[in-house]
């Protein structure tokens, strides 16, 4: 099924261990390269869906000069969107707790922008998943943030961690998207378009 990917040297440009884990689950050969410093600011005029697309394209642009003829570069960015506000990675522990308090008892949207780049073509797409949290107590938020230190996660949580077990009451869309890479979509896009 994934034989069309064998013609590429797949390069995942990501610092995210979750994206690495998800790509490894496909049982395909790939390399990981750490991201250089990429400016993750974005124009204020962008919608929630456009923000992670823009950032994933900026990440791809930072790597383009290192690509070879057979390279397939995968870059991604994930945000949490609630009431017109972006929740990216928290700045510190206090910010992480504030984010989880804002998400508590509400439904938010996790949006991941993915860019697939070869020397011949670039394809970008966004995937959205709705996630509903139970009302979280301060003790639950404190425990999670202190024990799991979710400073590298959009919205200050990992759905695959303790907070997901006790706090997520509903999920509509791709679970893997909430982890950081909607893995089904890149596979189908490479098969159809690259």
Report residues per predicted region.
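Cofactor-binding loop segments of dinucleotide-utilizing enzymes, especially the Rossmann-like FAD-
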Residues: 15, 35, 119
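A short beta-strand-loop structural module common to alpha/beta enzyme folds
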Residues: 32-38
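Anionic-ligand binding patches
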Residues: 3-6, 10-11, 46-192
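Residue-level detector of anion-binding/catalytic polar loops
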Residues: 29
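Surface-exposed, flexible loop/turn segments at secondary-structure boundaries
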Residues: 18, 38, 122
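Generic structural signal for helix capping and beta-alpha/helix-loop junctions
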Residues: 40-42
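N-terminal beta1-alpha1 ligand-phosphate binding loop
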Residues: 5-26
């Amino acid at each position: 099924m994934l034989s069309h990917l064998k013609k590429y040297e797949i390069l995942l440009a990501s610092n995210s261990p979750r994206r690495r884990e998800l790509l490894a689950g496909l049982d395909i050969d790939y390399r990981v390269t750490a991201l250089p410093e990429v400016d993750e600011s974005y124009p204020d005029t962008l919608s929630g869906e456009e923000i992670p697309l823009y950032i994933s394209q900026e990440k791809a642009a930072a790597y383009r000069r290192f690509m070879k003829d057979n390279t397939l570069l995968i870059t991604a960015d994930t945000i949490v969107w609630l009431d017109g506000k972006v929740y990216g990675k928290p700045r510190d522990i206090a910010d992480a707790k504030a984010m989880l308090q804002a998400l508590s008892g509400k439904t938010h949207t996790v949006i991941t922008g993915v860019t697939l780049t070869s020397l011949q073509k670039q394809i970008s797409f966004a995937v959205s998943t709705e996630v509903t949290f139970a009302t979280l107590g301060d003790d639950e938020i404190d425990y999670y943030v202190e024990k799991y230190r979710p400073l590298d996660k959009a919205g200050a949580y990992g759905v695959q961690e303790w907070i997901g077990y006790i706090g997520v009451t509903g999920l509509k869309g791709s679970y893997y998207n909430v982890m950081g890479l909607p893995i089904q979509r890149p596979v189908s896009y490479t098969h159809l378009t690259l």
